[in-house]
Swiss-Prot record:
Transmembrane segments: none annotated. Probable cyclase; part of the gene cluster that mediates the biosynthesis of ochratoxin A (OTA), a mycotoxin composed of a chlorinated type I polyketide dihydroisocoumarin moiety linked to L-phenylalanine, and demonstrated to have nephrotoxic, immunotoxic, genotoxic, neurotoxic, and teratogenic properties. OtaY is probably involved in the polyketide cyclization. The keyword Isomerase applies. The lineage of its organism: Eukaryota, Fungi, Dikarya, Ascomycota, Pezizomycotina. Disulfide bonds: none annotated. One of its GO terms (biological process) is ochratoxin A biosynthetic process. This is Probable cyclase otaY. Belongs to the aurE cyclase family. It comes from Aspergillus carbonarius (strain ITEM 5010). InterPro entries: NTF2-like_dom_sf, SnoaL-like.
Amino acid sequence: MTTPTPTTLKHHATTILTTLVNDRQTAAIEHLLHPTITLKHNDLPAMSKSELIAFWPEVLAQSPHFRVQIRDVIAEGNKVWVYSRVEGRLGEGVMDDFHMMVFDEEGLVVRSTGVQRVVEGEM
């Protein structure tokens, strides 16, 4: 297998976020996550792949108006940074959202860290 290009990794990163949030299809991203991935978020404990797959539908159930809009994506080597705007996550208003993802040589995410901050009030 050839090493994924930055364009491919950017596509994987944006697909993960839009599929999880806008399409609300948690299981549809499993093939892009490494079996031993570590997922971190500024307001949640670290999670494994199986913990994310079990937990994420709960977030969606509590966030019927949750949406993400990708604003910018930067790839360098095996790392991708995604800047987006989200709204409706767990009743929050509009937030800046940054995800930093590290990919392996097969194009699977091995580590993801997300940080959000509210920029407009609660919904």
